[in-house]
C-alpha cells in the first residue's frame, strides 16, 4: 500500500436534498479517507447514504457543506470545466449498468475516454489489462454480443485504461450472477494488489465486500463502523446489526 496523501478524503461532509420540512439529510457530517493502493468497500442499509457518499467523493454530485479532496485537489475550488477534466484524467468509474457505447467494439469502448480526450493510449498497459480480464478473444465484439459479465469486465478495463488515481465502482456486480461477479471482483482485487490501483466500491453484497481490504459501514448518513480483513460472514453479521 502506498503512503502519503490519501487517494480521496472527505471532511465533515453534509448533503441535504430538498428544503424545509421536506429536507433529507443524506450525509450527516461524514469524515473518511481512502488510502492509495487499497481496495475499500462502502456498505449500509438502503437509504444509508452509501451511493451519495461515493457520488460526492467522485465529483458526480455536489456536497452541501464540507470538503472533498481527490489526491491534493479540493473539488469545491474547481469550476465545471476543471472538474470535468479531473474526473476524466484522475478518476475511473464502473457502474452497475456497464455504460458501454453499443455501437463500439469492446476494444473501442476500453480506450474511449482517452480517444475523447485526444490522448494516445498506452498500448502495453491496455494489452495487459485486456489479458488480465480475459477479453482478448472478444475485442471485436459489440456489447450486445457479450454476456453481462463480459460487458462489466470491459467497463472495468476501461476504468483502469488511463491509469487513474482512483476507481469508484457503484454496485459493479449488481446485475451479475455469482460466477461473473467473482471474475469482476477478482480483477478489481488484482488491480490493487498487482497494479497498485486504488478502488472504492459501493455494494450491498457481503460476498462482494469480502474482496476488499477494508469495509466502511454507513447508517442514516453517518459512518457507524469499519472492518479490515472482512469475510462475507463477518460483513453479513454486521449488516444484520444495521437492520438490512
Predicted regions: what they are:
Residues 1-5:
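Short, low-complexity, intrinsically disordered N-terminal peptides in bacterial proteins
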Residues 6-214, 218:
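ABC family nucleotide-binding domain
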Residues 222-244:
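Conserved beta-strand-loop-alpha-helix hinge in the C-terminal portion
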Amino acid at each position: 500500500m502506498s503512503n502519503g496523501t490519501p487517494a480521496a478524503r472527505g471532511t465533515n461532509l453534509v448533503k441535504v436534498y430538498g428544503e424545509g420540512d421536506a429536507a433529507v439529510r443524506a450525509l450527516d457530517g461524514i469524515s473518511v479517507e481512502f488510502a492509495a493502493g487499497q481496495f475499500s468497500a462502502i456498505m449500509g442499509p438502503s437509504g444509508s447514504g452509501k451511493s451519495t457518499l461515493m457520488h460526492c467523493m467522485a465529483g458526480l454530485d455536489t456536497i452541501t457543506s464540507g470538503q472533498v479532496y481527490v489526491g491534493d485537489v479540493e473539488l469545491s475550488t474547481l469550476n465545471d470545466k476543471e472538474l470535468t477534466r479531473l474526473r476524466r484524467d484522475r478518476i475511473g468509474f464502473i457502474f452497475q449498468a456497464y455504460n458501454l457505447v453499443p455501437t463500439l467494439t469492446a476494444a473501442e469502448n476500453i480506450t474511449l475516454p482517452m480517444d475523447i480526450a485526444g490522448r494516445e493510449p498506452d498500448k502495453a498497459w491496455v494489452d495487459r489489462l485486456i489479458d488480465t480480464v480475459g477479453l482478448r478473444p472478444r475485442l471485436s465484439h459489440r456489447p450486445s454480443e457479450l454476456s453481462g459479465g463480459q460487458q462489466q469486465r470491459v467497463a472495468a478495463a476501461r476504468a483502469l485504461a488511463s491509469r487513474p488515481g482512483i476507481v469508484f465502482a457503484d454496485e459493479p456486480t449488481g446485475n451479475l450472477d455469482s460466477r461473473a461477479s467473482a471474475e469482476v471482483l477478482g480483477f478489481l482485487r488484482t488491480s490493487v494488489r498487482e497494479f497498485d490501483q486504488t478502488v472504492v466500491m459501493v455494494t450491498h453484497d457481503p460476498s462482494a465486500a469480502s474482496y476488499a481490504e477494508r469495509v466502511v459501514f454507513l447508517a442514516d448518513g453517518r459512518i457507524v463502523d469499519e472492518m479490515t480483513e472482512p469475510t462475507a460472514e463477518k460483513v453479513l453479521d454486521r449488516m444484520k446489526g444495521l437492520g438490512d
